[in-house]
């Protein structure tokens, strides 16, 4: 059921942190402190620029054009709707000596409003800065013992100062990249966070309000040895201490991967399904 749904189901079933389940009036089946803990994601921050040429997707998002794009895709599987519009992605190291790419930069030929998620009404583009291996950890908690109540998702983005420092470094790297001559005929004014937003304090103020998710939540029922009190499943996805129960999704990852979670989740499902079947 995913990194949110799987710990939710386990805790409702009495498998999870003893004190938390008791506070929700749920009978304990197995005291498992790691259920719902260790939540990881790839935090995301968007830098937006005016585009000096009329080459963005903004005109195609107007009502009639968007209807036409939908019809085109239904008939031909081509056109604007055939792309996710992250046409260029770079996985980079934030500096010398960094062991693995710890930043993901994605450029999109349109800029969106952070609140409404509607396109800005001008030719503009945005660059996403994503953290690939965070130090901050969140958690999933029950809101009640009613299965229809959604759980609490506490992501704790940038709580660890190392994540905040890395995000600021990513913003500076994007600005350095966009200042290269190859972008001179495209890059206009920085719309957000703005050319005057340079100090750590100013950037942190923007990060606090505008850091969002890449929707790569994982690691809330992590795989590990039975001797690890925070491990939930073994290397076959079997829940420790429970017979005939497995979890097979992104929640069992011990650490979030250095990239999108879709392909690794498919790999996990393919691998464990061979054992089940």
How would you label these PLM feature ranges?
Residues 51-58, 68-264, 272-277:
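FAD-dependent oxidoreductase catalytic-site/capping-region signature
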Residues 1-70, 79-80:
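Glycine-rich loop(s) and the adjacent beta-strand/alpha-helix scaffold that form part
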């Amino acid at each position: 059921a995913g990194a949110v749904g799987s710990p939710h189901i386990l805790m409702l079933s009495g498998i999870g942190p003893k004190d938390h389940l008791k506070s929700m009036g749920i009978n304990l089946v197995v005291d498992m402190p790691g259920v719902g803990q260790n939540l990881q994601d790839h935090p995301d921050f968007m830098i937006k620029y005016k585009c000096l040429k009329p080459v963005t997707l903004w005109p195609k998002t107007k009502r009639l054009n968007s209807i036409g794009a939908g019809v085109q895709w239904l008939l031909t599987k081509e056109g604007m709707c055939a792309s996710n519009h992250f046409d260029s992605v770079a996985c980079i190291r934030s500096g010398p000596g960094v062991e693995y790419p710890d930043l993901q930069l994605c450029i999109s030929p349109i800029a969106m409003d952070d609140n409404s998620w509607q396109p800005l009404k001008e030719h503009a583009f945005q660059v996403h800065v994503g953290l690939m291996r965070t130090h901050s950890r969140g958690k999933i908690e029950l809101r009640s013992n009613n299965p229809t109540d959604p759980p609490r998702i506490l992501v704790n983005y940038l709580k660890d100062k190392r994540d905040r420092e890395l995000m600021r470094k990513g913003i500076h790297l994007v600005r350095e990249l966009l200042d290269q001559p190859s972008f001179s005929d495209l890059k206009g004014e920085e719309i957000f966070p703005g050319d005057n937003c340079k100090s750590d304090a100013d950037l942190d103020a923007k990060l606090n309000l505008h850091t969002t998710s890449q929707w790569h939540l994982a690691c809330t029922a992590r795989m590990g040895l039975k001797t690890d009190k925070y491990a939930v499943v073994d290397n076959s996805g079997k829940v420790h201490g429970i017979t005939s129960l497995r979890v097979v999704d992104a929640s069992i990852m011990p650490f979030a991967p250095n990239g999108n979670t879709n392909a690794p989740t498919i790999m996990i499902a393919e691998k464990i399904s061979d054992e089940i079947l």
